[in-house]
């Protein structure tokens, strides 16, 4: 690793419509090949569809869905002696958010349907209701951590 100074993280500008930094980060993660305007349109269209389907504030549904999918613990491989153990570890807030976003976007892309905005809206509504593929992924990660609780003392 270099010995240069550590650069400060660039601040993320909030999005224009909802004035939310989290929405901007989500758009950035969802973007393919630098097509930000297309991704932003998909995001806002899916928010309109959420408002239409649930009748609730889309930003509130989005943030609750994100909170429902955020994992608290995950397993990491640790080599001790000749054996490799899956050790449960707490996750820092930034990684929790990143994983939740990644899982929601991945689940929306795998869904069957025509428009990405429709698939994303459906996945966000499912995550809001504690169902759906992204929520199942979180449950699976938590189950793995619970199953390997015996190795928690290898944490360092």
Curated annotation (Swiss-Prot):
Coiled-coil residues: none
GO BP term, example: translation
GO molecular-function term, one example from the UniProt record: tRNA binding
GO cellular component, one term: small ribosomal subunit
InterPro entries per UniProt: Ribosomal_uS7, Ribosomal_uS7_bac/org-type, Ribosomal_uS7_CS, Ribosomal_uS7_dom, Ribosomal_uS7_dom_sf
Source taxon at top rank: Bacteria
Entry keyword set: Ribonucleoprotein, Ribosomal protein, RNA-binding, rRNA-binding, tRNA-binding
Keyword Membrane carried by entry: no
Signal peptide limits: none
CDD domains xref list: uS7_Bacteria
Family of the protein in this entry: Belongs to the universal ribosomal protein uS7 family.
Quaternary assembly: Part of the 30S ribosomal subunit. Contacts proteins S9 and S11.
Function (record text): One of the primary rRNA binding proteins, it binds directly to 16S rRNA where it nucleates assembly of the head domain of the 30S subunit. Is located at the subunit interface close to the decoding center, probably blocks exit of the E-site tRNA.
Classification via HAMAP family: Ribosomal_uS7_B (MF_00480_B)
PANTHER family linked to this entry: RIBOSOMAL PROTEIN S7
Protein name: Small ribosomal subunit protein uS7
Gene: rpsG
């Amino acid at each position: 690793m270099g010995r240069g100074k550590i650069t400060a993280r660039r601040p993320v500008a909030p999005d224009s419509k909802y004035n939310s930094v989290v929405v901007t980060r989500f758009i950035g993660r969802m973007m393919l090949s630098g097509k930000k305007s297309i991704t932003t349109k998909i995001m806002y269209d899916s928010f309109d569809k959420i408002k239409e389907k649930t009748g609730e504030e889309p930003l509130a549904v989005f943030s609750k869905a994100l909170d429902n999918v955020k994992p608290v613990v995950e397993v990491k491989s640790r080599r001790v002696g000749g054996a490799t153990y899956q050790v449960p570890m707490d996750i820092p807030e930034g990684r929790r958010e990143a994983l939740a976003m990644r899982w929601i976007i991945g689940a929306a892309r795998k869904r069957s349907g025509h428009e990405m905005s429709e698939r994303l809206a459906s996945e966000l509504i499912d995550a809001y209701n504690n169902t759906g593929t992204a929520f199942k992924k979180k449950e699976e990660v938590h189950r793995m951590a619970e199953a390997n609780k015996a190795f928690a003392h290898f944490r360092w």
